[in-house]
Design a protein with these regions (language model features):
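Positively charged, low-complexity terminal tracts
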Residues: 1-125
Length: 125
């Protein structure tokens, strides 16, 4: 097992072949095309998906755009973040914890609605 940092070389339209460090969490670059710009190179980790009754609701994964020209943390950043597709944003740890807490609260509200519906359907109006 090599202890050397991983690197990858990707062809780009504006810089030719670009060699860059490949984070251990990156799962590769299957969607990269030779006519992509260097600024479009991004790393992404394994997706964590929310599936309900066989239906894909959303997913999230660690992402990083090492050459982004618009370093906007919620959209594209040199600093790794977690991209959450349902909100179309990339979050830092604090924001991700906040989203998780909000989803916990929402899950509680859904349970309350289920209880209300159960009462309604059971004739407990």
């Amino acid at each position: 097992v090599s202890t050397e940092p991983r690197t990858i070389t990707l062809p780009t339209a504006d810089y030719g072949d670009v060699t860059l460090p490949e984070p251990a969490w990156c799962t590769g670059h299957p969607n990269h095309q030779p006519d992509d710009q260097r600024a479009d190179i991004h790393h992404s980790g394994p997706e964590v998906s929310l599936i309900w009754r066989g239906r894909h609701i959303t997913d999230a994964c660690i992402v990083q755009s090492p050459f982004t020209e618009t370093d906007i943390p919620e959209l594209s950043s040199r600093t790794p973040g977690v991209s959450v597709s349902v909100i179309a944003r990339t979050l830092d740890p604090t924001s991700l914890y906040d989203l998780a807490a909000t989803l916990d609260t929402y899950a509680d509200q859904l349970r309350d609605l289920a209880d209300q519906l159960d009462t309604l359907l059971g004739g407990g109006q």
